[in-house]
Amino acid sequence: MTLRIFDTGTRTLRDFKPVQPGHASVYLCGATPQSSPHIGHVRSAVAFDILRRWLMAKGLDVAFVRNVTDIDDKILTKASENGRPWWEWVSTYEREFTWTYNTLGVLPPSTEPRATGHVTQMIEYMQRLIDNGFAYAVDGSVYFDVAAWSKAEGSDYGSLSGNRVEDMEQGEPDNFGKRGPQDFALWKAAKPGEPSWPTPWGDGRPGWHLECSAMATYYLGEQFDIHCGGLDLQFPHHENEIAQAHAAGDKFANYWMHNHWVTMAGEKMSKSLGNVLAVPEMLKQVRPVELRYYLGSAHYRSVLEYSESALSEAAVGYRRIESFLERVGDVEVGEWTPGFEAAMDEDIAVPKALAEIHNAVREGNAALDKGDREAAKKLASSVRAMTGVLGFDPVEWGSDAGADGKADKALDVLISSELERRATARAEKNWTVADEVRDRLADAGIEVVDTADGATWKLQ
């Protein structure tokens, strides 16, 4: 069967035809580690981890790039407000994102580039845009000329988001020599006290959109298969990525996939609304594998409305699968059902795929009740194949001293690192930093216990 993907760019289901037969190239907009990850962030990681696993299951060699935006305005602002170096701030939260990905069984990317490590590629990209007449330098900053590009032959600016050029606002100040209000920064001139890198146009730091265009094409080539990300990135970020790439002469991504939001009481989960749920807090209620099951259970293009009852129902659903496999005993991974394959090939329709799994579980339990262990074992093998594709095969999760043990080990590594930073601060009599570490851990439901032998921790 042929995988069909809903391409945001054309708003249609399209047959997936990779640029290079037998291979798939995928770029996912990853974390901006300005603060702790919440389940809104993690839903995107789980959704496209499932996509990646399905591509692999279909026999494709997958190059999966997930970037880290390790420099931007919010990072600098928050680091400054808390009296910490920007790079230390980033490192702290990047570790939290990595722990979260690992705890929920998200496969490590083939490459995880950081923006600050690719300034050379960004300079080359800006030079191409300037040479092509679609970018200009002003007082150390470099801007993309939206008007020039939108009038150029072959321009498709606005097609991804459906916005008209005259209605677009980039959020960039208009008083820094921009030619037009829609123009956006490729490079931001250095400001006192901020990190900067040298370029032919002056010292400064990267613009958000430039980072991804430069890194995606550097690792995956000027034309690659799939670009993924959250729906909120569609404009301006992804729209501007496309503009930069096409204006530079790159074909860029053939397919665009966007996951919808996690909402609570009908509102998008966001830090500004104060309705975010941190992963450690949620792991007090369910195991990591059950949280993964929940986050992946809705279609990636559908809103995932959070409630405690929905989370509990998901955990019960997973335990039903787990219980069946425990009843059967040891079985090898078999083959998925035709219905499962059809569901996954139709734009990664996980709800339909889960229905196939639960049908097999019901039939398997019925077979066991009748004493037909061979039929039950065959169904269990199929269940393992299907749950493996979705990243929650109970046997695999159970093989590492249980999912709880896996989470505890990862959590201990993360918190121990923070306790070491606190111990250093206390030794230097930097009580502000020491208290900040303690308070931030407390906000995540972790109590620091000081003993004669040093600090330890426990869940509140």
From Swiss-Prot:
Its main location: cytoplasm. The keyword rRNA-binding does not apply. Pfam families: DALR_2 (PF09190), tRNA-synt_1e (PF01406). Gene3D superfamilies: Cysteine-tRNA ligase, C-terminal anti-codon recognition domain, HUPs. It catalyses: tRNA(Cys) + L-cysteine + ATP = L-cysteinyl-tRNA(Cys) + AMP + diphosphate. Binds 1 zinc ion per subunit. One of its GO terms (molecular function) is zinc ion binding. One of its GO terms (biological process) is cysteinyl-tRNA aminoacylation. Signal peptide: none annotated. It is found in: Cytoplasm. Its EC number is 6.1.1.16. Monomer. Belongs to the class-I aminoacyl-tRNA synthetase family. NCBIfam families: cysS. This is Cysteine--tRNA ligase. It comes from Corynebacterium glutamicum (strain R). The gene is cysS.
